[in-house]
């Protein structure tokens, strides 16, 4: 419903463009057209068919470090995330959410019981129009507690 703006003028040898200023969860629609120098101005082709896309959250990388009596989880910030859900599974149980972290959080320490295997996964989320949208979960990290 918004209007189109010119992002960039590219030379004839450039066949792609990366829009680096997009916001996660926002729909963007793009069109292109060719131009040719004609005297002191340009001749323009018709616009291409519109193509739409919505930027999604990236899959987070999760690191697990085990020390005596605790496990330390750390990750890099996911661009556009409003925060993270941290899930834990003990042994063969099922995953349960153990923490909801802010977007500024990149580390969390969990107390553990020696000999128990713990598994973790991290899910980024973004609040869009007062609704939570989850991104892809990290790979599961598992380790036996010391």
List the model feature ranges, each with a label.
Residues 19, 30, 53-55, 71, ...:
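Polar/charged side chains located within well-ordered beta-strands of beta-rich proteins
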Residues 19-42, 108-132:
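Beta-strand-rich modules
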Residues 14-16, 27, 50, 70-72, ...:
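Intrinsic-disorder/low-complexity, polar/charged segments enriched in Ser/Thr/Lys/Arg/Asp/Glu/Gln
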Residues 24, 40-80, 130-146:
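Pro/Thr/Ser/Gly-rich low-complexity, intrinsically disordered linker/stalk tracts
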Residues 27, 81-85:
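Exposed beta-strand and adjacent loop surfaces of beta-rich binding modules
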Residues 1-23, 85-114, 127:
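Recognizes extended acidic, P/S/T-rich segments that occur
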């Amino acid at each position: 419903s918004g209007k189109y703006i010119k992002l960039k003028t590219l030379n004839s040898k450039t066949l792609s463009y990366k829009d680096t200023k997009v916001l996660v969860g926002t729909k963007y629609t793009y069109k292109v057209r060719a131009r040719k120098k004609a005297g002191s101005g340009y001749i323009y082709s018709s616009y291409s068919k519109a193509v739409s896309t919505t930027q999604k959250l990236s899959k987070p990388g999760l690191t697990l470090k085990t020390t005596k009596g605790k496990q330390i989880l750390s990750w890099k910030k996911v661009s556009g995330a409003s925060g993270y859900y941290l899930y834990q599974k003990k042994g063969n149980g099922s995953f349960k959410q153990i923490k909801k972290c802010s977007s500024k959080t990149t580390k969390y320490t969990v107390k553990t019981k020696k000999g128990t295997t713990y598994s973790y996964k991290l899910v980024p989320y973004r609040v869009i129009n007062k609704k939570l949208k989850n991104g892809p979960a990290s790979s599961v990290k598992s380790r036996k507690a010391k």
